[in-house]
């Protein structure tokens, strides 16, 4: 069996987007999608200051900044702070205290992140890790901030002194007041580390046999590349407009219609972007989907099915532009080894991802490889007329690797120059990845232990589809395809364009 080590983040220089070079400024930060923080009405008292005053800077003024952080999410209940239950450990809870102790938050603002304009790059669930999460806020800064330190590494190290070992601040950069990392992020890059035993690759396999299985798995993963409705890979209701919601009339006149349906859907999609793995009380049991397909029976009772084709519109289960996502890359790397466990690193790059989307993509691909689901299930599931229940893979080996931005062109905001991370920041990220993240993530690469053993056992028992339901879906898909012959030509053209957009060497996106 081939042996190598977990790869460290590749230093970034530039990133080629489909038609242009993405240009980002060091004054803004080159990584992250952001979801605005929801303000809490609960306020906290500042923590005891007995042991940190020597490490606390003196505030000179308040400035909007963007902080890049990395963390191992194993010991935390996700990123987002939980005001209702202070006993719940979160990344933001630790970070807020550390910034306060370093001098970045005033006593009067501590405990209310809304006051300081706190926004995050992702709301990761427990077990999800990151090397490229960004937090933006209006922070109290010292007079010497960024003097001979353009990446803000001195500020970063001061904050990191007050953080546990599994959370690290890499840089603190000044930000334009109008910079919106969520809206201006054009690419998000994730990695998923998958034990090869799950794919059926054994220690006794020859190199040729290993290459065959990985190549075959890549053919399955490539089916996800392109722009499709990924409604079967998330909780659909989270991305659906409320049909009962009424817009109040202004001055006795009906509200203005949006300029276009496309523009309206785009705005809704942006406002409802939920990063992969958002913290919530999971309703899944052992990886089962949390959203069933309901079919009315002849006696008006409800029957739960696992696969269905909608021959008629379902007003209670609409699919809109908010359910569409563009995936630029979904590929597996070669066999690697860490602590004696063989694994492959799956790279998933896209504009944005919905709740559970990546984990369901991985779970479905594994089920296809294990011959529990048919080869055409991915193609069928990416059609807006299908409703299919798909498996959800574990979260413990999902890592946010990086993001890219395209700064919006506004009259008061001139163009930005492209730069990569400084060598000092790259070194800090590499050190954290090797010394902290790798040892802790590697323990989840043992397919004979949790979470993989339970997940695979459940997958093998429960994730097949009823033949009659599947045949009905295929029949509906064939009729739909026959009615739209131009779709085949468009699909070919889209595939060629997508491949050309990622054919150039792509470095770690920041």
Curated annotation (Swiss-Prot):
Source organism (scientific name): Arabidopsis thaliana
Biased composition annotated in UniProt, kind: Acidic residues: 277-289
EC number: 5.4.99.-
This protein's UniProt keywords: Isomerase, tRNA processing
UniProt similarity note: Belongs to the tRNA pseudouridine synthase TruA family.
UniProt binding sites for substrate: 190
SUPFAM superfamilies reported in the protein's UniProt record: Pseudouridine synthase (SSF55120)
Active site per database record: 125 (nucleophile)
Taxonomic superkingdom: Eukaryota
Segments for region (Disordered): 235-300
Protein name per UniProt: Putative tRNA pseudouridine synthase
A Pfam family hit: PseudoU_synth_1
GO molecular function, one term: tRNA pseudouridine synthase activity
Amino acid composition bias (Basic and acidic residues), ranges on this chain: 254-276
GO biological process entries: tRNA pseudouridine synthesis
Catalysed transformations (reactions): a uridine in tRNA = a pseudouridine in tRNA
The organism's taxonomic lineage, starting at the top: Eukaryota, Viridiplantae, Streptophyta, Embryophyta, Tracheophyta
CDD domains given in the database record: PseudoU_synth_PUS1_PUS2
